[in-house]
């Protein structure tokens, strides 16, 4: 497989991977579709700095000019931030088209996992994963993120599944595909903006060292899939359960009324929830990404010792 034909690994990232040093992958959809410019660029650079401060090398992943980038420069992050939603939100089905056309794409959880794995990066920090959408029993709207977690051996550190989803069905899907769902310091699945969901994770894990040991064992056992680490949003940034659920219900009703579906759904719902919560949800979103970056870097450092 002539991967290097399309893959560009940043020198710092390549050096770290080759030397067994800790590296953390980051997605780029959060830059293009997750928040407005210039806040998106500032946040992305802050996340990279948090990873450095915790001893690891950050690798922001994107598709630029048909090249799969494992590690972006500040200029490339700035470019993605300015382009915003004009950049294609790229899932697995888009990769070949974007590469063949020499086009740009912002990576979702799915494509970030794929490109991280190609580049030899084992850990990836994000905000929240996609999952089974509410009403999926009639729409079949299930995020490709879940399929990637079933097939690609990368640890994904997130704040749970986005609470706009059907969390029960999302957990069922992950169980069917053999993906372990670990709760960092919690038995309860966090729901992105809030620390509670009413659903249990498979196992509570309390230290980065144990997270690393579990991932290492999975690798040694030759298990093909990924692993989901759910890290609750810090208490002080957590939103009121009732407030956020009310906003989500309203946002879903608006999406249905406007006939919004497919990959436009999540950006629409997140923007609507932000509007309904007076921007509080965006602040929470930024803080939980910082928190996940910290844990991912600490876990990557522990993994590099094994």
Place the predicted regions along the sequence by residue.
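Divalent-metal (Mg2+/Mn2+/Ca2+)-assisted nucleotide/phosphate chemistry catalytic cores
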Residues: 73-153
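Anionic-ligand binding region
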Residues: 195-220
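Glycine-rich nucleotide/cofactor/substrate-binding loop typically near the N-terminus or early
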Residues: 28, 33-35, 41-98, 220-236
């Amino acid at each position: 497989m002539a991967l290097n034909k399309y893959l560009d690994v940043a020198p710092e990232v390549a050096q770290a991977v080759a030397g067994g040093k800790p590296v953390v992958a980051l997605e780029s959809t959060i830059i293009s579709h997750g928040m407005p410019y210039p806040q998106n660029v500032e946040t992305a650079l802050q996340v990279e700095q948090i990873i450095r401060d915790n001893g690891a090398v950050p690798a922001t992943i994107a598709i630029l000019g048909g090249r799969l980038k494992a590690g972006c420069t500040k200029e490339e992050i700035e470019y993605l931030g300015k382009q915003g939603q004009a950049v294609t939100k790229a899932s697995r089905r888009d990769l070949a088209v974007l590469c063949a056309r020499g086009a740009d794409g912002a990576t979702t959880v799915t494509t970030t996992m794929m490109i991280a794995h190609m580049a030899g990066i084992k850990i990836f920090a994000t905000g929240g994963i996609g999952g089974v959408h509410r009403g999926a029993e009639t729409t079949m709207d299930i995020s490709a993120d879940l399929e990637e977690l079933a097939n690609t051996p990368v640890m994904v550190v997130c704040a749970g599944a986005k609470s706009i989803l059907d969390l029960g069905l999302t957990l069922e899907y992950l169980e069917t595909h053999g993906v372990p769902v670990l709760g960092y310091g919690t038995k309860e699945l966090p729901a992105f903006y809030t620390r509670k969901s009413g659903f249990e994770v498979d196992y509570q894990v309390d230290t980065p060292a144990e997270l690393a040991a579990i991932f290492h064992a999975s690798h040694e056992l030759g298990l093909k899939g990924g692993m989901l680490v759910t890290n609750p949003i810090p208490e002080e940034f957590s939103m009121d359960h009732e407030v956020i659920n009310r906003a989500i219900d309203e946002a879903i009703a608006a999406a249905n009324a406007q006939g919004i579906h497919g990959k436009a759904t999540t950006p629409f719902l997140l923007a609507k929830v932000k509007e309904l919560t007076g921007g509080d949800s965006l602040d929470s979103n930024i803080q939980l990404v910082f928190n996940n970056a910290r844990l991912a870097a600490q876990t990557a450092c522990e993994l590099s010792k094994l």
